[in-house]
Amino acid sequence: MTNLKLDVQTADGNINGSVELPAEIFDREVSVALLHQVVNAQLAAARQGTHSTKTRGEVRGGGRKPFRQKGTGRARQGSIRAPHFTGGGISHGPKPRDYSQRTPKKMIKAALYGALSDRARNARIHVVSELVPGQTPSTKSAKAFIERLTERKSVLLVVSREDINAQKSANNLPGVHILAADQLNTYDVLKSDDVVFSVEALHTFINRASGAAQEEQN
């Protein structure tokens, strides 16, 4: 594993130094099975699970036998709310449930690092000093800068929570998804073609990852 160096791009098209991507985060082995499991768990946890159908015992009415048991020539029936009747209850229908799956933190972290490593190896991670120059939000400037960084349509923009200027500038751009450094996750990394970090957000993410690694060792 080797550390990767990336140039820091500025909004006016210049290069403002470089940053080093630590190998323990951005040069890990990628397990497709692990990525699949973690993404499935993440999507499952996002499901509301509030779906509910009524059984024959919950549908209003149907307490009286519709006709006598014998002598009519018809098949015997006990309730007009039986599942085979129109307007009857649903048999084996969905009920409210929790779809979330228990996924160990180490697996979640390994999947995220694997996804970032895949993007880094394919030159799909970019680092910028700022998204737009100055203190005034500009969607036009943000769009031009991102298009200069990559020609791909789907971009994940990772900025600090305090960078309101960047958030407002890119909020309405189609194909651009904005996250804070502590919100970074496997699904959004894999869903996006390129990942654009602000320098501040990148340092925040690396520091959080390093701190978590030290806690595990202790």
Swiss-Prot record:
Q: Where is this region: Disordered?
A: 46-102
SUPFAM superfamilies per the record?
A: Ribosomal protein L4
Cited Pfam families: Ribosomal_L4
Give the record's GO CC terms.
ribonucleoprotein complex; ribosome
Please indicate if the UniProt record lists Ribonucleoprotein as a keyword: yes
The protein's UniProt keywords, in alphabetical order, are: Ribonucleoprotein, Ribosomal protein, RNA-binding, rRNA-binding
What's any GO biological process attached to this entry? translation
User: InterPro entries, alphabetically?
Assistant: Ribosomal_uL4 (IPR002136), Ribosomal_uL4-like (IPR013005), Ribosomal_uL4_dom_sf (IPR023574)
Compositional bias (Basic residues): 62-73
Annotated Gene Ontology MF terms? rRNA binding; structural constituent of ribosome
Function, please?
Answer: One of the primary rRNA binding proteins, this protein initially binds near the 5'-end of the 23S rRNA. It is important during the early stages of 50S assembly. It makes multiple contacts with different domains of the 23S rRNA in the assembled 50S subunit and ribosome. Forms part of the polypeptide exit tunnel.
The record's similarity note reads: Belongs to the universal ribosomal protein uL4 family.
Q: How does it assemble?
A: Part of the 50S ribosomal subunit.
Q: Which HAMAP family match?
A: Ribosomal_uL4_B
Q: What PANTHER family does the annotation carry?
A: 50S RIBOSOMAL PROTEIN L4, LARGE RIBOSOMAL SUBUNIT PROTEIN UL4M
Q: What is this protein called?
A: Large ribosomal subunit protein uL4
Q: Which organism is it from?
A: Corynebacterium glutamicum (strain ATCC 13032 / DSM 20300 / JCM 1318 / BCRC 11384 / CCUG 27702 / LMG 3730 / NBRC 12168 / NCIMB 10025 / NRRL B-2784 / 534)
